[in-house]
Amino acid sequence: MSDTLNRLAEVLEERKHAAPDSSYVASLYHKGLNKILEKLGEESVETIIAAKDAEHSKDYSDVIYETADLWFHSLVMLSALGQHPQAVLDELERRFGLSGHDEKAARQPSA
């Protein structure tokens, strides 16, 4: 896993045990999963809007910024659920060489 993701995962774990007023992330953890999911939803919408704007303007700085926020809040959510970013990377690695159609079909129950 990248050094950046490892460092971020470590910081997120540390923030779980910090006072809510000590950092933004600590305050999110203190407010609970629903607040974290609310933020994740907001960041998802902001990323979509930035992507639509970038399509026309060809200025990608906002979509990069918003995607970073989206990834960050996704990592906060995973951490709140006791999951490490490596689990997502492992899942992405598992999907290499697997057709998206085949993967989707494997998830659907047979009739």
From Swiss-Prot:
GO-annotated cellular components: cytoplasm
Catalysed reaction, written as an equation: 1-(5-phospho-beta-D-ribosyl)-ATP + H2O = 1-(5-phospho-beta-D-ribosyl)-5'-AMP + diphosphate + H(+)
Top-level taxon of origin: Bacteria
UniProt keyword terms in alphabetical order: Amino-acid biosynthesis, ATP-binding, Cytoplasm, Histidine biosynthesis, Hydrolase, Nucleotide-binding
UniProt GO MF annotations: ATP binding; phosphoribosyl-ATP diphosphatase activity
Principal place of residence: cytoplasm
NCBIfam families the record matches: histidine_hisI (TIGR03188), PRK00400.1-3 (NF001611)
Matching CDD domains: NTP-PPase_HisIE_like
Family, as annotated: Belongs to the PRA-PH family.
Originating organism: Pseudomonas putida (strain GB-1)
InterPro entries hit by this protein: HisE, PRib-ATP_PPHydrolase-like
EC number in record: 3.6.1.31
Compartments reported by the entry: Cytoplasm
Pfam families the record matches: PRA-PH
Record pathway: Amino-acid biosynthesis; L-histidine biosynthesis; L-histidine from 5-phospho-alpha-D-ribose 1-diphosphate: step 2/9
Biological process, per Gene Ontology: L-histidine biosynthetic process
Record protein name field: Phosphoribosyl-ATP pyrophosphatase
